[in-house]
């Protein structure tokens, strides 16, 4: 009777209704994950655009002279990096929102591009942070005086733009983790061999 009961439970568990429910749950999870990833890719579009606009409009003229973001290579790099990041974020969000079957080539493409964009925007923020730090503190070793005491408005806008850039870095760090998971989850776990058995077989041969 216990064997009959086990067979009934197996038959019930493998019924078409429950199989259909399992497939529905799986498709629902994929849809919700796709929605979350799409939103995460849209957020950097707004962040990069705001950082870009703030830096583009960042210039100040006073009795000490005039200063613009274009006078410093680090800030020009920040502008270009934010522009590239905004464009890629928008395109990747559109592709992510499209319900397409996952393929290995697509997973590799998103993984590599997300990694490149993460380091690109991180480098832009780091280099700009160093420049604005020198603008605030100066460097006595090379007799550089601080510039922010004379161009306070310029430094404030620069700090705001850099801060927004680092928020973008956090978003792309999360996106890199997601794309890494989606890629490497497609690979099977490595097969573990019994080393002792292999040694014995080699010895007897």
From Swiss-Prot:
Coiled-coil positions are: none
- Highest taxon of the lineage: Eukaryota
Output the Gene Ontology cellular-component terms.
plasma membrane
Tell me where the transmembrane regions lie.
36-56, 78-98, 107-127, 158-178
**Which residue spans belong to the Cytoplasmic compartment?**
1-35, 99-106, 179-205
* Subunit structure, interactors included: Homodimer and heterodimers.
Name of the protein in question: CASP-like protein 2A1
């Amino acid at each position: 009777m216990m064997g009959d009961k086990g067979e009934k439970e197996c038959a019930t568990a493998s019924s078409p209704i429950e199989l259909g429910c399992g497939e529905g749950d799986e498709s629902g999870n994929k849809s919700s994950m796709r929605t979350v990833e799409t939103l995460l890719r849209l957020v950097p579009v707004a962040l990069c655009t705001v950082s870009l606009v703030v830096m583009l409009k960042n210039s100040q003229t006073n009795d000490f002279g005039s200063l613009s973001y274009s006078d410093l290579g680090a800030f020009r790099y920040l502008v270009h990096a934010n522009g590239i990041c905004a464009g890629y974020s928008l395109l990747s969000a559109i592709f992510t929102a499209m319900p397409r079957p996952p393929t290995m080539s697509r997973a590799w493409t998103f993984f590599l591009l997300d990694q490149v964009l993460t380091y690109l925007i991180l480098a832009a923020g780091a280099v700009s942070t160093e420049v604005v730090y020198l603008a605030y503190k100066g460097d006595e070793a090379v007799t550089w005086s601080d510039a922010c005491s004379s161009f306070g408005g310029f430094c404030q806008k620069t700090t705001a733009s850099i801060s927004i850039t680092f928020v973008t870095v956090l978003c792309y760090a999360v996106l890199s983790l997601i794309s890494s998971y989606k890629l490497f989850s497609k690979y099977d776990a490595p097969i573990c061999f019994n080393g002792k058995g292999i040694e014995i077989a080699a010895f007897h041969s």
